[in-house]
């Protein structure tokens, strides 16, 4: 099943970002403000808070190297994966950007899992696996994986 996801195509849509993504970004901002910079690595990508998982979407876009990664911002244990976002020009000094993806749609509500990033038609395009849980007649749950596409503004 292919699902098209259309994030942040212009500034107007950016103002209408999902509640989950807005919540994650606000939480990141609060945690970053409360974190002593001396506790963070100088030359290594790290999440602003929570659990960090797989690197994804390593790409060159708009003159910078972008690295996305799965992470759960609300806990230091595994949970519904979001995509964090960092950029660099030299592969040594990394700048943390706001979260890029949050599990906020029916097709990815159990998490935004592994994927890639490319540039297409001047847009940064994220292709990832969205995961949902499907309740079975016997009461058990089964995971369904959906291929998703997010079109970003590169910020």
Model-identified regions with their sequence ranges:
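Beta-rich carbohydrate-recognition and catalytic domains
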Residues: 8-155
């Amino acid at each position: 099943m292919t699902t098209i996801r259309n994030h942040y195509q212009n500034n107007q849509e950016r103002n209408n970002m999902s509640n989950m993504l807005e919540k994650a970004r606000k939480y990141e901002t609060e945690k970053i403000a409360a974190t002593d910079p001396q506790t963070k690595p100088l030359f290594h990508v790290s999440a602003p808070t929570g659990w960090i998982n797989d690197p994804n979407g390593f790409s060159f876009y708009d003159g910078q190297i972008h690295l996305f990664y799965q992470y759960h911002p609300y806990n230091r244990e595994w949970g519904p994966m979001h995509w964090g976002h960092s950029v660099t020009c030299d592969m040594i000094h990394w700048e943390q950007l706001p979260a890029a993806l949050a599990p906020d749609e029916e097709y990815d509500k159990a998490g935004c899992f592994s994927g890639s990033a490319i540039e297409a038609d001047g847009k940064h395009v994220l292709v990832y696996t969205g995961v949902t849980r499907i309740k079975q007649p016997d009461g058990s749950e089964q995971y369904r994986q959906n291929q998703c596409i997010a079109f970003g503004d590169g910020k």
